[in-house]
Regions:
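Internal, well-ordered alpha/beta segment that forms a basic, Gly-enriched binding/recognition surface
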Residues: 1-64
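Small-residue-rich helix-loop
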Residues: 138-158
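Short His-centered aromatic/hydrophobic patch
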Residues: 98-132
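C-terminal non-catalytic accessory extensions
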Residues: 182-225
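Surface-exposed helix-capping loop/turn segments at secondary-structure junctions
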Residues: 75-85, 132, 205, 209
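Inter-helical turn/loop segments and adjacent helix faces that build the functional surface
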Residues: 52-57, 79-84, 105-110
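GST superfamily/GST-like fold recognition
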Residues: 83-103
Length: 225
């Protein structure tokens, strides 16, 4: 939601993103044809914003969640390189997937460069992190950033996933949920309900009491059981 919001909220980002998408996917287009195609993708994506919760009403919570995430990562990357050891994990690359786009789109790029340049640099380095060997941290060595990110999930995302799944289960077309003390509303999203069910089913297969303790301490456990 953060990436989609920043990509299509402001005029300057709409113009940049639509042209970039068309230029990347259809590099042979030029002039009027390029402008026409860019306008079409722009209109389509802007029109989809309410479907994914990117509305003026939700804008404060979405932008707050972005700055909160950046602050967590900023306190981390000034001391460590990877979340779970001296080698990258799927978690690092998962964050990279979204942050790479945010680090190249106009407005979020400026936010990252001006406010958290260390995070901007970290994202850039992650792009060339394949093949790095290293060691995994033990549970006792878990970095504060990991628990901070889990609490972040328990504040901004897991409540949304549960509310979305519950709304679908009750045949509702819209959901409303409190995230970090603010009301967030959007139409239900079936794919995310599928993702939530998969996440819970995978967790049910794990027999790891120490993991349950960490998740409980970070307020994630109630959303996964």
């Amino acid at each position: 939601k953060i990436m989609f919001h920043y990509r299509w909220d402001l005029e300057v980002d709409q113009q940049y993103s639509s042209r970039q998408i068309i230029s990347d996917n259809t590099p042979g287009l030029r002039g009027t044809a390029l402008a026409k195609a860019a306008r079409a993708i722009r209109d389509r994506q802007v029109g989809r914003m309410p479907l994914v919760g990117c509305t003026p009403q939700n804008k404060p919570i979405i932008e707050q969640s972005f700055h909160t995430l950046l602050n967590i990562l900023d306190s981390f990357v000034t001391r460590d390189e990877y979340l779970f050891g001296t080698r990258p994990a799927l978690a690092d690359f998962g964050l990279f997937g979204q942050l790479k786009t945010l680090a190249s789109d106009h407005t979020p790029m400026l936010i990252m460069r001006n406010n958290v340049p260390s995070v901007y640099d970290w994202v850039r380095r992650l792009e060339d992190s394949s093949g790095i060997e290293g060691e995994w941290h033990s549970l006792a060595q878990m970095r504060t950033a990991v628990t901070d990110l889990l609490r972040y999930c328990a504040t901004y995302y897991l409540p949304f996933l549960r509310a979305n799944a519950a709304a679908i289960a009750h045949g509702q077309t819209n959901l409303s949920v409190e995230l970090a003390g603010q009301t967030f509303e959007q139409p239900v999203f079936k794919y995310q309900a599928k993702c939530y069910a998969r996440l819970k089913s995978l967790f049910a297969e794990v027999d790891a009491p120490p993991l349950r303790t960490v998740l409980s301490d970070c307020d994630c456990l109630p959303y996964l059981e």
